[in-house]
Each structure stands twice: as structure tokens, then as C-alpha cells.
Amino acid sequence: MTVSTASGSGAGDKPGSAARTGPDGPAHTVDFEAAQTPRGLGPRGESRAGAWGLTALLVSLYVINYADKAVLGIIAQPLREELGLSSSQIGLVGSLFFLTFTIGGFFAGLLNRWMTLRWSLVLLALCWAAAMLPMVVVASFAVLVLSRLFLGLAEGPSSALLHTAAYSWHPPARRALPGALLAGAASISKIAIAPLLAVITVSFGWRWALIALAAGGLIWCVIWLSTWRNGPYIASGKTTASADAEPATPWISIFRSRTFVTGALVVMSVYALVSVVLTWLPSYSEEGLGYSRLQSGSMFAFPSIVGLLLMVLSSITSDRMISKGATSRMLRIVVPSVGVLVSGVLLFLLPSVGTPIVAVAILSIGYGFAATVFPLFNAAVAEICPPRQTAGTLGVFLAIMAIGGLVAPYATGVIVDAAATPAEGYATAFQVLGIVAAVCAVLALVFADPERDRARLRPQAPAVEGATS
């Protein structure tokens, strides 16, 4: 069903449609012709089962993506022992990854124009697999740095391209859930893959963990090439007629919008927390809380379970409420921003907690509430730009997000080295992350409004598809 977001009468009305009155007067136009779409098919005749199957394939690549990131945290202590590394050096490696990850994110739009999604994602996945192998052959600090720099550069464009591919199969009003599943790939990776990598590391050595990740990437490429096809909702590579129908918006106007700026600050601050969890959670669990190495490698699961549940629940609720006429600002800005505020309060209290299991619970719940920003803010930012500019807009948005990962792991290593005990250092680092995220969430609550910015940046935008009466 199609819903027009134009205000007033006649804007977007057409035969077979009816006006729906919102709190500020006529706000929506419901297309009853679209409502008659056969069961199992979407507004543009696409198979919904096929759409979700291909979305699952994209999520599986994101699981590999996050496993490649998380493996450094899992093998950090064995690497430290074998290569004689300090906490600051491990943190530096984690941050350098996000340096090239940030740079790579700016190439998402270019890749989307130069290559089809089919081949651009294969290229990236092959690069990830190749990045795992140098450390297997020659283990040294220099090789570790270079391999992580290359991995970061190759992973940088992936998030925007994966979201673009997923959004191509889902109408705008129903994108929070597929976005949540993509964001939830981090949790799936830490719940299902990280414990397996921990077992491999403890049983066979850290090199075999890297080999397993490389093999997983190669297997995914074979499946992808035999199944993927582009969806009907977003142009990729060669633009479609429907995408061409809406004029492009100046890039500077998109990037200067208050929704984009404050949204980028929030996701950057939360991604700083994510990157510290990826790099340091096993070390915090082992050195700071006294758990065994195998237990510490499995600790990824706890914050990830909470994060995955909250992301999926909030995204399902968001899609359903927006389909029924609720505002995008309330569901995609206010709700996740309040979640970040809750996270900030919990992380601020972490240094005062002396019981290991309570510390794990606080960190897990705080992480879970903060993680809800990713699918919802991504959907909000995609809303303010024309379809042909989605990959480029999300590429820059997510590249800015990755700056949090550039700074936070190294800063955490410095704090831990300077602290009286590892436990005190890790807790202080998480406290600082909570304060910064809470401040950024307040800015988004005050300034971000995707509906306002969509109306200003996209005056000729077509009706929002995918809503139901």
C-alpha cells in the first residue's frame, strides 16, 4: 500500500486512494489498489519470501564481517603472549583498523557506481579472506598492523552496500526490521561465531581461527554468485526509471541536515562502545573480572543477546507503527536516543560495581539499549535522501560512525595501562564512553527530525511505499 507524506489536500491523491487524517490534519494518502496485492507479494510484485531469503544471505556476510573484526579481541591475549605486546599496542591495532575502515566507507558510493552489487560485495569478501592469511604465514606486530589496515579498508564500504542491497528488497516504510537484522549480525557473530573461534583458538591455536574465517568468506562468495539478484526498490549501478524520476539532492545539503549531523554523532559515540567491546571485552573479562580464557571468549554472547533482542523488537515495533501513521521522528529518533541515555547511565555506574556477574549484566544491558540506534538511525538517514543517493549517503554516514572505532580502542588501551588495576582501567573507559554517548543522544533528541528534513531536501519525493491502513 502506498502512503503519501504530502500535507494538505490533493498532494499525491489519485484514483483508488483515500485521505487519512493525522494529528495535524490530512497527512497520509492510502492507496487501496496497492492494498490488493496478492498474498506473498510486495507492493511491486516481488516475492516476500525471496526478499527475506536474500536478506538472510546479506546478513550472513555481515556475520562474517563482524567475526573478522571480533577475532582480534579473541586472540588478543595469545598474541600478546607470543609477540610480547602491551595493552596500548593491542589497542593501537584495533584503532588502526578503524582508520582505514573510516576511509573505506567513503568509497561505498563510488563502488556502487563502478560495479554492480553482485561483484562489489564479492570483491570485498575476497579481500577480507585474503587479509586473514598474512598473520598465519608470518606472525609479527608489523604484519598484524598491515593486515588489519588492509582488512579495515576492504570492510569500510561494506555496511552501506549491504544496507543498499537489503533496502532494494524492502519498501521504505518497512526497512527498520531488515536494518535491524543487518545490525544484529554483530550480535549473531558474537553469539554463534565468537565462542566457536574461542574454542578453535584454545584447542588448535589462534592461526586456525584466522584460517576458518578465510574459508567462511570463500564459501559465502560461491553461494552469493549463484543466488543474488537486485530488488525493485533502490537503484544500484544502472539506475532505474523510478529512481531517475526524483531529482538528485545536493550532497552538501544532505550532509548538513540536522538529522544527518546529530545522527552521525550518536552512531559514532555508540560505535565507539561497540569497537571497545569487540577489541577489549575478552581481555576485560579475563584480566578485569577473573574469568577463564575460554569463558572470556564466550562473553561476547551476553551483550550481543540483549542487543539483538532489543534491536529486533524496536525495529518491528517501529515498522508497524510507522505503517499506521506514527511519526518517523518519534520511532526512529526519540526511542533509540532514549535507549542511549539509559545506556549512558548504566555505564556511568560501572566503576562502582565490584561483583563480576553484575558488571557483565550492566555492560550487557547498556550495550543492548545503545545498539538500537543502528537500524533505526540508518533508516531515518535513508529517508532524507533520494534512492539513487542512498549508498553514497549511508557510506559517508557510516564512515563518520567508524571514527568512534578509530579513537576508542587505543584510548581504552592507554587508560588500562595507566590505571592501578586492569579492572579499574576497563571500567573507567566504559564510563567515559557512556557519558559521551548520552551527550550525543541529547543533541539528537533536540535537533534530529527526518520528516522535516525529507520535506526540505526531497520536495518531489514520491509516496512512501509499504504502509498499511
Language model features by range: what are they?
Residues 202-214, 292, 331, 414-435:
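A membrane-interface helix-boundary motif in multi-pass transporters
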Residues 182-231:
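Helix-loop-helix hairpin linking two adjacent transmembrane segments in secondary transporters
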Residues 126-139, 337-354:
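C-terminal ends and interior cores of transmembrane alpha-helices
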Residues 103-139:
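Conserved MFS/SLC helix-loop-helix module at the cytosolic interface between two early adjacent transmembrane helices
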Residues 84, 116, 137-143, 171, ...:
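Helix-breaking motifs and short loop linkers at transmembrane-helix boundaries and internal kinks
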Residues 72-73, 258-315, 374, 378, ...:
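Extracytoplasmic gate region of multi-pass secondary transporters
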Residues 38-47, 231-264, 288, 464-466:
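Juxtamembrane intracellular "pre-TM" segments in multi-pass secondary transporters
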Residues 147-187:
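Cytoplasmic helix-loop-helix junction between adjacent transmembrane helices
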